[in-house]
């Protein structure tokens, strides 16, 4: 049975924090959050109460969703999955992040509490590129988790929620079996990408943002051994 990322047994020593002004918005509510350590050492931040004084339910829902999405290991890395989607010609799916014309990357996303890696993979596959498990063939996953650190300028200030210093990911190699028109970038309310294209296998290593290049080099080198 695949191990889940979730809360597991609660330690008696769990403690509580109070984060104010969700998302840096002065009008947003304060939310009390429990930091809970599971059996596998994973820290899961979940809201257990709130103060709705003068705030809209939409703001609260957005804040609660953000808090529910955060699964952080004991070193401060958010756990997630990444996917290398390859077509029949050996080219890789490459997406441009919304609002940043120079930021291209592979699809990726964080684990939700109590979600398996495969469940996270299937959810992100749908949310980011509009594909289902029936559109791809699972080929391989990286032997180890691979981490990268976020530059300090991209890290969330501590007063705005749990501190995350980077991401720790399991990567999957998927064979795309459908037609290009099956790929859709608007399958969720907040799309990750606004453009996509196929690129040569090693192209991403030199064109992803600098702090992810080592990750991409490791992932593609490992997968290259399999597809030769």
Swiss-Prot record:
Enzyme class name: hydrolase
Short sequence motif Nudix box: positions: 109-130
Species of provenance: Coxiella burnetii (strain RSA 493 / Nine Mile phase I)
Entry's EC annotation: 3.6.1.-
Cofactor names: a divalent metal cation
GO biological processes: mRNA catabolic process
Alphabetical list of NCBIfam families matching this protein: PRK00714.1-4, PRK00714.1-5
Signal sequence bounds: none
Nudix hydrolase domain segment(s): 76-221
Protein name: RNA pyrophosphohydrolase
Annotated region (RppH domain), positions in chain: 71-228
Region (Unknown), start-end ranges: 1-70
GO molecular function annotations of the record: mRNA 5'-diphosphatase activity
